[in-house]
Regions:
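Conserved, helical-rich catalytic subdomain that frames metal- and/or nucleotide-binding sites
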Residues: 141-169
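Active-site neighborhood of divalent metal-dependent phosphoester bond hydrolases
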Residues: 27-30, 34-151
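N-terminal active-site segment of His-dependent metallophosphoesterases
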Residues: 1-36
Length: 169
């Protein structure tokens, strides 16, 4: 932040997911970004979603993940950080600035408005009572997106579509 001369009075930082499990300082990264509060905008990446899922597992299973993630999972402020991550978005659109941010790309057929609406479906589960069931069923490549999908199949497909990289033809 010193190098870029970050000034919280005028600057806002945008973080494009994968806040954890990159570079070996996940706990420090989360704490720093959390401390920036209103001076930052975040979208979740697949690594962040994985951390949320791991955070719901039994302690014995959490101890099997890499040491970097273990430091997050067993930190004194884990509950605060996990709760804060759960409140972040999958898609952020700033219409005033004319910019949008997602972690890795959007489904080619989705408009930003549609992407926001679909992302909100998953975000509501992340933030609400459906969190534990969502993260248990969130991962996997199937089914492919279809407008007739419902329940966890739909949420899994939305998460995948909001996190996928556009494939070259």
């Amino acid at each position: 932040l010193e190098r870029i001369r970050f000034d919280p009075a005028v600057d806002r930082l945008w973080f494009c997911g994968d806040l954890v499990n990159r570079g070996g300082q996940s706990l420090e990264t989360l704490r720093l970004i959390h401390s920036l509060a209103i001076h930052s905008t975040i979208v979740l990446g697949n690594h962040d979603l994985s951390l949320l899922a791991i955070s719901t597992r039994r302690e014995a299973d959490q101890r099997k993940v890499n040491p970097d993630l273990q430091r997050v999972l067993f930190a004194d402020d884990t509950e605060i950080l996990i709760s804060w991550l759960r409140r972040q978005k999958l898609v952020h659109v700033d219409r005033t600035l004319g910019f949008a941010m997602v972690h890795a790309g959007l489904a080619p057929k989705w408009t930003l408005t549609l992407a926001e609406a679909r992302a909100r479906e998953v975000e509501e589960k992340l933030q609400g009572d459906g969190f534990f069931k969502l993260v248990k069923n969130m991962f996997g490549d199937k089914p492919a997106w279809g407008t007739k999908l419902t329940g966890f199949d739909r949420q899994r497909a939305i998460t995948h579509m909001a996190e996928q990289k556009k494939k070259k033809k």
